[in-house]
Amino acid sequence: MENQPKLNSSKEVIAFLAERFPHCFSAEGEARPLKIGIFQDLVDRVAGEMNLSKTQLRSALRLYTSSWRYLYGVKPGAIRVDLDGNPCGELEEQHVEHARKQLEEAKARVQAQRAEQQAKKREAAAAAGDKESAPRRERKPRPAAPRRKEGAERKPRAEKPAAKAPRAPREEKHTPVSDISALTVGQALKVKAGNDAMDATVLEITKDGVRVQLNSGMSLIVRAEHLVF
């Protein structure tokens, strides 16, 4: 077809697929798990439409299946669907576990980014506060001191005690975790997020890192370089 509009972003491609295959794709809300091999089905069904290329379809599928709402839908008992919404088998346990880990890691990244941004804002606010001087109070003129009579003996001035220099705040030092195999379940440690360190408890030692639980109740897998005592 001539003069077809071109989709320029993966989000636009996803919106097109949700309109073209409403029983398979969704533009909002919890998404349904897709049939394995659905990429080839898409190539066969929408080849040439909207000037879509295989690269655009592959990028849109990658964005769609890595979104939080799609990962939420990958859960035990969920059924995969094809382009027309027909069931294509129940999800396997390994796929459910993989999606759960992806979701936890994504949430942890977002939380770490927020903590880092908040720390930078605090530092910027503190720096700005040091530069801005407080408004000065208008000084009242001092009354003139009475003149000392000639020949009167001067009293020695009392020396002012030297002002003590303010103590610098003690910086909390953390010891990095060098060997995760030495950790034990239930052990308390901290997870580094930017300039902050969040309290956590060891739940499990895995090949990918250490599964910990934060004080908020959230559990996530963290690599050794982000763990300190």
From Swiss-Prot:
Family matches, as SUPFAM superfamilies: FinO-like
Compartment(s) where it occurs, according to its Swiss-Prot or TrEMBL record: Cytoplasm
Compositional bias of kind Basic residues: 137-146
Pfam families on file: ProQ, ProQ_C
Gene Ontology biological process terms, A to Z: post-transcriptional regulation of gene expression
Top-level taxonomic group: Bacteria
Any one GO molecular-function label of the UniProt entry: RNA strand annealing activity
InterPro entries recorded: ProQ, ProQ/FinO, ProQ/FinO_sf, ProQ_C
Function: RNA chaperone with significant RNA binding, RNA strand exchange and RNA duplexing activities. May regulate ProP activity through an RNA-based, post-transcriptional mechanism.
Family that this chain belongs to: Belongs to the ProQ family.
Name of the protein described by the UniProt record: RNA chaperone ProQ
Native species: Escherichia fergusonii (strain ATCC 35469 / DSM 13698 / CCUG 18766 / IAM 14443 / JCM 21226 / LMG 7866 / NBRC 102419 / NCTC 12128 / CDC 0568-73)
